Swiss-Prot record:
Biological function: This protein is involved in the repair of mismatches in DNA. It is required for dam-dependent methyl-directed DNA mismatch repair. May act as a 'molecular matchmaker', a protein that promotes the formation of a stable complex between two or more DNA-binding proteins in an ATP-dependent manner without itself being part of a final effector complex.
Keywords: DNA damage, DNA repair
Organism: Gemmatimonas aurantiaca (strain DSM 14586 / JCM 11422 / NBRC 100505 / T-27)
Single Gene Ontology MF annotation: mismatched DNA binding
Top-rank taxon: Bacteria
Gene name linked to the record: mutL
Protein name as annotated: DNA mismatch repair protein MutL
GO cellular component, one term: mismatch repair complex
Keyword Plastid belongs to the record: no
PANTHER family: DNA MISMATCH REPAIR PROTEIN MLH, PMS, MUTL, DNA MISMATCH REPAIR PROTEIN MLH1
HAMAP family listed in its UniProt record: DNA_mis_repair
Presence of the UniProt keyword DNA repair in the record: yes
Amino acid sequence: MSRIAILPSAVADQIAAGEVVERPASVVKELVENALDAGATSVDITIEDGGRTLIRIADNGSGMDGADAVLALSRHATSKITSAEQLVGVRSFGFRGEALPAIASVSELQIETASEDGSGTLVRVQAGTLTETGQVARRQGTTVSVHRLFHNTPARLKFMRSARSEWRAIVDAMQAIGVLRRDVHFTVRHDGRVALDWPAVSTLRARLAALWGAADVERFVDVDDVQGVVHVSGLAERPADVGTATRRVLLIVNGRVVRDHGLIRAAEAAYRSTIPAGMRPSLVLQVHVPGGDVDVNVHPAKAEVRFRDRWPLERAVEEAVRRALGLFDASAGIGWRTWSAAPASREPGHALGGIPLEPSALRAAPAPEGLFATPAAADANLAQHAIATATAPTADDLTSAMQVDAMRAEAAREMETLVVPPLMQLRKTYLMFEHDEGVVLIDQHSAHERVLYEQFLGVLERGEAPSQRLLFPLTLHLGPQEADAFEAHRDAFVRLGFEIDHFGGTSLLVQAVPMPHPRFDAERCLRDTLAALIGDRGASAAAKHERLAATFACKAAIKAGDQMSPGEMQALYRALAATVLPAHDVHGRSTIVRLSWDELDRRFGRK
């Protein structure tokens, strides 16, 4: 006797419901997406008891006639596709014909619908069984009411959370849909009151302002970048604001909200060297790729997708966010064009407080005085070294290369016309200058660290740096772990300008070193860098380069307490202005702080 039997349709429907209908929020998502697929421009949602007793979705979409309303309750009945070929690049939210019958199998469901040409239809279903059909007077559109969700599946019912928890999940689901379809008016009522009301808007910022509040949206910079066939747009949190509010992450791929840790990690990688380790930014990103490059039919709830070629896509996302942060950092956040001009009322040759400066310190383009006195820095514009980005353009990415070249050219032009204001050093730690709108302070170590990081990263990715041979070579005796760290990064150290030979056992003979500034302590910097790189052998080449560049920049930069000459201060100012992300060092700390005259007046009681 056979022990294998085909399950009854009611049982099969409940199994399918377990994949599609996890909780009330899942029902809301599926039914609202059906409304949007029907062309609705207005969707009203009614929730009672967190969706446990009632979920009602009413729309003004195309509606259905009587036959389609009944047929829609059958598994795999859909109007979205008719062949397997249409699965490639499908743009509708739904296409499997599973959600509505799955919901009907675990609830008491009622459908009222009317198409443009037909009369209204009423359909009632009890736990998957059709109990009533008839006619009803109504306008075009569809209203789906779901009562007593999971009433016939006690095992599922007992896993329902409190009404408050289920309501929060519904709000989260609706926020994702609201961001996705900004052209639709959504109204959500909960227990008799209007809880959410989002009129149709034209921009992402406007929708997020309605969802989160205008103040929250101010924390974000715009992302809009095209690389080849990939278009990345949206909003990314400003580095200085990361960690100051609730973290929110929303990823939209080809008009569908999805979960993809790889793309989110790629976007977060753009923040490396701008925020402290362990902190994660808020992101709202929209990614558009050709339909044939993405498979949406890989998850029961269509919450995950599969990409044909993931690596170029992740690179495009990272580069888009990095560019957005760079443009913000170099203009809106710092405002070099605004803050670099010296006050017209101040006599030339005097900085804040009337302290005289050397006449040479006021020239628009002074020769670097020690701080960048390497052959490369003497022979090339500082901007060409400092504008290096964390992702070097490759031969197969012509668009990216052209954009990077344009950024460098723009930076070079700005550096040619940049007027360095009179600078003074405070406590051998900060540089300060005055502007019509306030006072600006620069942390000399953090600023130099940022400059060196971008220079070193560019050197590691594009070629070797010049070095200076030592009259008396250094002998370093390393421990086993330090020696292993050196072997893991040997080629990178050579690119940075070190010439190092083995000297027996774990000893090294250092013949030549880079010289980022006259006070550079090569032996200490090399030892400290190797100590910080212990255990980094297994990382990718790109991660190793970033880690080494950040660590070496931190160790090699001038320190608090180092006296700087006027020429060195000007050189640092110019180099920082030419970096991609001037506002933060490699640890995410601020390099620049500005105090407006209004703030100073308030502190002194003048306002």
